[in-house]
Amino acid sequence: MQSLFSNKYKFKDTEEKLNAYWDKIKLYKWKNLQGKQFIIDTPPPTISGQLHIGHVFSYCHTDFIARYQRMLGKDVLYPIGFDDNGLPTERLVEKIKKVRAADIDRKEFKALCNEVSAKFRMEFKILFQSLGISYDWDLEYHTISEEIQKLSQMSFIALYNMGKIYRKLQPIFWDCADRTAIARVEVEEKEMSSFMSTIAFSTEAGELINIATTRPELMPACVALFFNPLDIRYQHLQGQYAIVPIFGNKVPILSDEQVKIDKGTGLVMCCTFGDELDVYWWNKHNLNTQIIISKSGTLDLKHNIAETDTLSGKLHGVSIVEARKLVLETLSKCNLLIKKEEILHNVKCAERSGMPIEILLSNQWFIKVVEIKHELLEQVRKINWYPQSMRKQIEMWIDGLNWDWCISRQRYFGIPFPVWYSKRDNEEIIIPDVNELPIDPTETLPQGYSKEEVEADVDVMDTWATSSLSPQFNSIHTGINSIPLIPASLRAQSHEIIRSWAFYTILQAYYHHNSIPWENIMVSGWCLAADKSKMSKSKGNALIPNQLLQEYGADVIRYWAANSRLGSDTVFSDEVLQLGKRLVTKLWNASKFVSMFVSQCQIPDLNCVTETMDKWVLTKLYKVIVKATESFNVFEYCVALDYIESFFWKDFCDNYLELVKKRAYGESVTNKENLSAVNTLSFVLMALLKMLAPFMPYITEEIYSTLYNNGSIHDHDNWPVVNTSLCNEMDEQLGEDFIEILNQVRKIKANAQLSVKCKIYKLIINSENYDFPTSWENDLKAVCNAEHIVQDKRTSYYNDKFLISVQFAN
């Protein structure tokens, strides 16, 4: 008998061949089959540079589900988009083209962004195709395209008309490095070293009081001092005024419950603005406003300057860090610096630039969030979260929100606000008709207005304001409005964007459709570097997928990605890649063995299965199909793979292939026994290939097409059916007893340092009242290489069900 397979699996040849084949037959094309939809809201990767293996990690997770659902018979809508507008793309362009957006013409810079974006989109596409990600590329989109710009601007106008969007001068988070407003979600805390300085203030009455602060440079912006009303040390100061040292401004002393009695001196400055608590006090107590930080991150004290040689004159125009140093030096010279203590503390920084943020007053666009927190929590609880623990993250985020979503950005490459500001009397904001969209107000005029009568809004929208409409993108690109694409079946994403992408999408779906955006959300963890830190190109610990694909092939990379618990961070592991490589080799070799017999039964006939051990392996297979199906149905791909792989190695390869060889070859067995073996081999391998196909699409397709010649393994309705006729509990127990005896025989031979092929003259089985079927005995003789099996049915006084002894032929 001859195998249909070469000695070694050549993954590079196979992947190239199958990618062309799948593309030719449009395997992943969405067919719009009514009633069988499975719609995936796909995360559009940001065009910010090369993808590393950490990005590949989560994109594979989504693909496992897409392939499984397709094999279940679902019509899977699996689009791919690219998030190529906004600051990340700008930064990439500035780095590659060695330009600064602020230094060149806006149109010229946007053209460079489009050029670079197109190049990286193509690179991403090639990588995703190399990984076997089963996107429908006919549904590709990118967020700076005219179609998406139109949708985003339509969303803005709809929300504006609903009264859910407003423009206002109010405190916002400001990134001085990128010179733009940012949203609360783009702020992260970093531990930094600083100084806690205790400074001597005085009241108008001349009483000395001490303030502890990490930001002495904000003293010119001090508008009040606060103490806790329960703090008896300062109750007598209520209603008095304090003099800010070296600057001389007079500020009220007030009480508020938010002051921590045991922090610092218990008496704190309120400046406009040092932090969010300052904003809270400013609003609550209707305090004055004294803004001294410019948008470039320098001190702006021109209104405080009387003479150029004053301290204010020296501070004007210098950086925040330098100003802090100068103020402390001056306080020290004036004997007003009581104490200066080095500390480590958390500082709010911009997520993108990594620089400390400031809170400034600025006119920005906002989407209302705070007033509908309760409604948003209700929406969150209508969605199935996998894992369930991830829901708590977004609930805590919503509970803690006290700022609306700032959606305007002072950048260049983004979607413009479709807004002009009228200079005519009694007019403020001009909004175009939706039929005119997309528009750039800096390049066009509203109908009936001259350029002297309007001022264009030059800001662009927060990238999330567009990508949070991703469920709606599906409707645009399918051209289908007759079926509901919201809620989608699944959103798949990683955990660090729960507060941004997940939250904003829930918000947009609620406002626009009064619906949840998806029925289920599957949340992946991070792929961590060897030192358990997040992979990052800037840290130099990110692995490039193309190198690993060349070395291991796509199936091994996908296997590695599948070996991560849903929602859990996973350390990148060469060991897991080696396990994947070993699995590919073993699957190829096992299939090579089975291929010698499959020609007899290309379509396996289970009516031919008569032998006990064949029924045993079919029962084990049935239970694996049930468990894998149940796991996939709740998006636990890792658990499904664990069940499948355990069955493949332990039950199929280690035991069944060994015990069935003699019958498969037809050596000294009846035709019935032979047919039972080859039909079982063929059926079990086919089911294994199908269950492994979502994880390892290339090798499973290659083996399946070679052996069974029955279309693609990834076709609809190709997932193994849960067939109860496969299950026979009695035969399963007989099989388990068989394996127990076999393992004891193997152990005896190993202890005697004999080959597993060493011939046994007599295999003696001590058991209590046990009758073995003839087919069972024949298989046991074959696999143990035993000439005779003798049963000793005396009453057993051993703990084990069987006591095995052997007499070797020699």
Swiss-Prot record:
Pfam families given in the database record: Anticodon_1, tRNA-synt_1
GO MF, one example: valine-tRNA ligase activity
Family annotation (PROSITE patterns): AA_TRNA_LIGASE_I
UniProt xrefs under InterPro entries: aa-tRNA-synth_I_CS (IPR001412), aa-tRNA-synth_Ia (IPR002300), Anticodon_Ia_Val (IPR033705), M/V/L/I-tRNA-synth_anticd-bd (IPR013155), Rossmann-like_a/b/a_fold (IPR014729), tRNAsynth_Ia_anticodon-bd (IPR009080), Val/Leu/Ile-tRNA-synth_edit (IPR009008), Valine-tRNA_ligase_type_2 (IPR022874)
Gene3D superfamilies per record: HUPs, Isoleucyl-tRNA Synthetase, Domain 1
One GO term of the biological process aspect: valyl-tRNA aminoacylation
Top-level enzyme category: ligase
Residue span of motif 'KMSKS' region: 534-538
Known function: Catalyzes the attachment of valine to tRNA(Val). As ValRS can inadvertently accommodate and process structurally similar amino acids such as threonine, to avoid such errors, it has a 'posttransfer' editing activity that hydrolyzes mischarged Thr-tRNA(Val) in a tRNA-dependent manner.
Subunit structure of this chain's protein: Monomer.
Family the entry assigns: Belongs to the class-I aminoacyl-tRNA synthetase family. ValS type 2 subfamily.
HAMAP family associated with the record: Val_tRNA_synth_type2
Protein name (Swiss-Prot/TrEMBL): Valine--tRNA ligase
Source organism of this protein record: Ehrlichia ruminantium (strain Welgevonden)
